[in-house]
Every structure is written in C-alpha cells, then in structure tokens.
Amino acid sequence: MKLIGYFRSSAAFRVRIALNLKGIAVEHASRHLRKGEHRAPDYVAINPQKLVPAFVLDDGEVLTQSMAILEYLEETHPEPPLLPNDPVGRARVRSLALIPTADIHPIQNLRVMAYLREKYEQSEEGTFAWSRHWIETGFEAYEASIAGNRHTGAYSHGDQPTMADLCLVPQVFNAARFKVDMSKFPTIQRIHTTCMKHPAFDAAQPSRQPDAEP
C-alpha cells in the first residue's frame, strides 16, 4: 500500500497518525502542493479530485478523502479502534471529527487561500485573518463540546485516541501557522499536548516527514 501526501497537508497528517496507531507499514510518496504537483496529469489520473491524500491499495484500487481512508483503515484493521464500541460514542466521535474536517479545513486550505489572493487581491495578512476567523469559530464549537463533558477524558472521547483526535491535532498545527490564540481553548490545548506525547502522533507530524521543508 502507498500513501501519497504532502508533509503539511492536514488530511494526509490524519491518515499518517492512523497508520502509526494501527502499526500499518506503507510506502510514502509526496506531491508538493505549492508547486502544483497535485495537478500533474499522472496524479490526476490517480485522483481526479487533485487533492491529497490518495491511498493506493495493493490491488491498485485508489481511495481518496481522508475520512473515507480512516473509515477503511478502521474496518480492515480494527485494532486499536479509532471509534468507541457504543453507537452514541461513535456518533459523538464522528461529530467532533467533522468540526475540523468539514467546518474548518475546507474553507481555509491552500486552494481557498490562493483563490482569495488571486480573485480578491487579498494580502497574506488578509488570508491569515480569514483562516484565523474560521479556525477560531470551529475551535469555539469543539471546545464547548468537550469542556466538562462526561465523555471527555485524557483525549477528546475517553482515555484512548479516537478519530476525533486524529482530526483535531492537524488543525491545531494549522492554527499555529495562522497565529491563532490558543489560550482561549484550554481543553483543546490539553488534549493536543497529550496527543503529541504519543509516539504515533509525534512521528506523523509535518516536521518529521521526508519531504518536510522549513
């Protein structure tokens, strides 16, 4: 199996964490998003969405969209689980995971930033302000959902990492890039610190990837 990603991609970061947690060894390849390598014809033939990650199975089948890949890994490699056993718990974890992946990331990723610059002549500070607004809006919802909740433990749900944490941590890394004041989100900060002490999260972070840049 092969994961095609980019060191700074939040979506690829989620999948790397899952692979590490489940002990799944795969080949890693990179497409440099800022250089437009994800739009090259050979990659578009693999993933017409022109996004990373793409997850190539041993039989040549290609999976796209990080959440679909996470669900595939959970179904094919159930241990350790990324979802709780109970229906309510699974729904809560998926709901939390969708805050970063559906409410935040799609409106502040690289292609949105590029569109704001090119179409609306936004400066870097303008695009950063846009990103900060949407990250903070999403984090306000995430923080309110986990702070004081009886299901919250060392991690977003209970005392083991779940799919929610795999989606939260990459977004916290993005928040640092866009200079978000994280002091407003103490529970998120605590959980992020806990996650980054886990070898699976630490090894998946952008700076530890072969294609990492300053």
Model-based region annotation:
Residues 100, 104-197:
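GST-like fold's C-terminal all-alpha helical module
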Residues 1-126:
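GST-like domain detector, emphasizing the conserved glutathione-binding G-site
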Residues 200-201:
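Juxtamembrane membrane-interface segments at transmembrane alpha-helix termini
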Residues 13, 36, 192, 212-213:
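Generic structural signal for helix capping and beta-alpha/helix-loop junctions
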Residues 45, 197, 206:
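Phosphate-coordinating loops and pocket residues in cytosolic domains that bind phosphorylated ligands
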Residues 74, 171-172, 205:
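Active-site-flanking alpha-helical
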Residues 162, 209-214:
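Carbohydrate-binding/catalytic loop surfaces
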Residues 33-34, 189, 209:
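Conserved beta-strand edge residues that scaffold enzyme active sites
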